[in-house]
């Protein structure tokens, strides 16, 4: 009997639905790629320069096993068209399948795919080997966003898939009774992933607990982290009302090796701002504050409030920052879209441990993000960092910064 293993990611996503940094969401569930390296587990420049696997200019190689497939000439990421997928009235999914004429070696890679959807949903890239064992890569795609490349992370394994001999590729979007909207896909690629897993530690919103709770834990291991500030909420004095960092505390975090990045001016949902606010001012004003206050290097990096984005916020993130973080899944590969780097938000202790174990086992890049810490989440952070220390000491993981990611792991 085949084993079915959810390597922490599924549990982490379930928890993320209750996180302080992401809206509650419900998920529907059912059951030549070899690379050269520089010798340290880091893909070489040549290895990361991958040609597209499929540009969807010719759809004959694909079969819509569930739902309908058609070319969309009015919407494309590359070339003259994309593939449009639509589910039928009684379908619980759309499923596009490509059977390969010969097994393909996709070991050590992660998929990237340009995706747009009318309804917010997880999208799945599933690889199946000759024995029928499979691995699911996923990413959350938001409604109202343009057709852009998404970096997919590892979600689950069924059996023991041999990724050096992939026979089928499935593109899947689960649907419900009230979310039968179209999905567009284009430009399927496979990017190399570092053999030695890379981990980023992040804190959203610029809460004072970054300084009072997180910093002492990370200092014990000499680990860097990133504090993404809602800059208009930073206090000038400890006596000022609020639960966000004081300006001097931000400086001490930076002096301790932390990256000070942006979570926008107010840390509000950029897809649903109140009157008088817009993504352009929320993002550009926060960057200006960071630059004016001596945090120029961190001003290059951004995390989307509540992990939500649309076309306007994507455009402004790209215009103002080198990297931006959103998503739900761990162990991505080289960032094919540097403004949608994946992350796992507010995991519980067990989920954080599983995500770290997954990254140690499979490599790739995982960002663990927390919001304001309370007693429970502080305990989770402490346990996760302790386990991270064990895996790092064993040579199985490495803690990196956004600058490291930008320098070495962007396509």
Q: Language model features by range: what are they?
A:
Residues 72-92:
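Short carbohydrate-recognition loop motifs
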Residues 19-28, 34-35:
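Bacterial lipoprotein signal-peptidase II cleavage site
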């Amino acid at each position: 009997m085949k084993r079915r293993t959810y390597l922490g990611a599924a549990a982490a996503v379930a928890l993320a639905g209750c996180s302080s940094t992401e809206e509650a969401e419900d998920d529907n569930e059912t059951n030549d790629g070899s690379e050269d390296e520089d010798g340290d587990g880091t893909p070489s420049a040549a290895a990361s320069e991958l040609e597209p696997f499929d540009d969807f200019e010719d759809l004959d190689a694909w079969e819509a096993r569930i739902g309908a497939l058609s070319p969309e000439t009015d919407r494309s990421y590359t070339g003259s068209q994309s593939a449009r997928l639509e589910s039928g009235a009684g379908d619980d999914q759309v499923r596009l399948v490509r059977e390969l004429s010969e097994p393909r070696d996709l070991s050590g890679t992660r998929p990237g795919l340009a995706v747009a959807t009318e309804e917010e949903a997880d999208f799945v890239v599933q690889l199946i080997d000759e024995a029928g064992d499979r691995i699911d890569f996923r990413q959350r795609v938001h409604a109202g966003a343009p057709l852009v490349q998404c970096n997919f992370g590892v979600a689950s394994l069924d059996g023991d898939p041999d990724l050096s001999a992939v026979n089928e590729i499935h593109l899947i979007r689960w649907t419900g009774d009230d979310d039968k909207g179209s999905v567009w896909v284009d430009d399927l690629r496979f990017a190399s992933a570092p053999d030695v897993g890379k981990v980023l530690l992040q804190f959203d919103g610029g809460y004072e607990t970054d300084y009072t709770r997180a910093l002492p834990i990370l200092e014990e291991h000499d680990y860097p982290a990133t504090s993404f500030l809602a800059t208009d909420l930073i206090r000038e004095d400890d006596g000022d009302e609020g639960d966000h960092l004081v300006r001097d505390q931000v400086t001490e975090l930076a002096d301790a090796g932390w990256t000070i990045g942006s979570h926008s001016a107010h840390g509000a949902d950029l897809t649903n701002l109140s009157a008088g606010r817009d993504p352009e001012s929320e993002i550009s004003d926060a960057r200006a504050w960071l630059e004016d206050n001596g945090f120029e290097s961190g001003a290059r990096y951004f995390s989307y409030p509540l992990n939500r984005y649309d076309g306007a916020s994507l455009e402004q993130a790209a215009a103002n920052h080198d990297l931006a973080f959103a998503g739900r899944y761990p162990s991505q590969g080289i960032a094919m879209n540097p403004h949608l780097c994946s992350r796992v938000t507010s995991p519980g202790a067990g989920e954080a441990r599983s995500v770290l174990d997954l990254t140690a086992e499979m490599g790739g890049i995982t960002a663990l993000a927390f919001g304001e810490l309370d007693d429970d989440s502080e305990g989770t952070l402490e346990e996760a960092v302790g386990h991270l220390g064990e895996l790092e000491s064993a040579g199985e993981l490495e803690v990196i910064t956004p600058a490291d990611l930008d320098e070495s792991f962007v396509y």
